[in-house]
Design a protein with these regions (language model features):
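Short hydrophobic beta-strand element within catalytic cores of glycosyltransferases
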Residues: 180-183, 190-194
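Donor nucleotide-sugar binding/catalytic pocket of nucleotide-sugar-dependent glycosyltransferases
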Residues: 7, 27-82
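Short Ser/Thr-rich beta->loop micro-motif in glycosyltransferases that lines
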Residues: 51, 152, 169-175, 195-196
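Conserved catalytic-core segment of nucleotide-activated headgroup transferases in glycan assembly
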Residues: 61, 70-163
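Generic beta-sheet signal
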Residues: 1-2, 51, 71, 130, ...
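Acidic donor-binding loop of glycosyltransferase active sites
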Residues: 46, 147, 159-176, 187-191
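Acceptor-binding helix/loop patch of EC 2.4 sugar-transfer enzymes
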Residues: 1-36, 97
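Nucleotide-sugar donor-binding loop of glycosyltransferases
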Residues: 2, 133, 170-172, 188, ...
Length: 196
């Protein structure tokens, strides 16, 4: 079982970094190594599954056997009941691990490029970022902007989902299946995401 082709994520993350960011060069060094490693791991097993056709193709490109099976991630609708939402005005939420570099990059891009455009049209908009271990840089942004809230980890996101007008997944780099998108759609939460 492979959750996703991780080398693709590292490659996309390297492409999303600016040339002045040292992380770009670490990722540029690491993704080809990871690509070879993932192919080698796939060759060691009699059967391998991937979560999407895209991941299967990426693993085959890396050198994995082509007889891989795709088993898409599914959402149990009984365990993800529809949520009756009653937002108190326009409210955007993001749920995701806030120490994962792809999520940090996504949130910074959203706050720099997209959120100001939304605020210009909807000055009363609120944005709540939910997820464990947010970096200090994002916490500082929230201190400077009263419309932005950073919660850190929450035991139960239900109150935030009930108050959400929409959920965002603004990834600029990623791989595999974004399960949170499936969960939110099953729960009736409007979703805006990038094409990654």
């Amino acid at each position: 079982d492979l959750h996703n082709a991780l080398w693709v994520l590292y490659k996309r993350m390297s492409e999303a970094q600016s040339f002045t960011n040292p992380m770009k060069y670490l990722l540029m060094r690491d993704w080809p190594l990871l690509k070879r490693y993932e192919a080698e791991m796939c060759r060691r097993f009699d059967a391998v599954t991937a979560v999407s056709e895209e991941d299967k193709a990426a693993l085959i490109e890396a050198g994995a056997p082509s007889d891989m099976t795709v088993i898409p991630i599914a959402v149990d609708l009984d365990s993800q009941p529809y949520i009756e939402r009653q937002p108190k005005g326009p409210h955007i939420i993001h749920i995701g691990t806030m120490y994962w570099p792809a999520n940090i990059n996504a949130i910074n891009w959203f706050l720099d490029a997209i959120y100001p455009l939304i605020k210009a049209r909807l000055p009363e908009v609120r944005c709540t970022l939910i997820g464990a271990r947010p970096p200090e840089s994002i916490i500082e942004r929230a201190k400077a902007d009263p419309s932005l809230t950073v919660t850190g980890y929450v035991d139960d996101p239900l109150p935030y989902l009930q108050d959400a007008s929409m959920m965002i997944v603004p990834l600029k780099a990623g791989g595999g299946m974004r399960v949170k998108i499936l969960n939110a759609l099953a729960q009736g939460i409007p979703m805006v995401t990038t094409t990654v």
